[in-house]
Amino acid sequence: MIVLLQRVLEAQVVRRAEGEQAEEPLGAVGRGLLAFVCAEPGDSTAVIAKAARKTARLRIFEDENGRMNLSAADIGGGVLVVSQFTLAADCTSGSRPSFSNGASPAEAQKAYLAYVEAL
């Protein structure tokens, strides 16, 4: 499992239907983390649980002394999780990336839901 984390003051994911102006909010978070998650073939429940634990406990927020010493949980922050299969892209040869390092859609959905549940 590949997880890319971004500290955010706020973040949201919206969907806009083709030809429409209105956006439909799908998820949002205030101060906390935006987690882009990519499942890889064979991700075990242990790997997924470890990734979720690491996300929740990673001390990347400043404490009162300005040191990165607090986790998202410590600051009462949330985590907005976005499935992002492109993190598995292999661009080592040619001009077209290969996504063979990513899990199948069914396996990825299962891993994504397990990650969210473990958070």
Task: Give a label for each model feature.
Residues S93-E107:
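A charged helix-plus-loop insertion that forms the helical arch/lid used to bind
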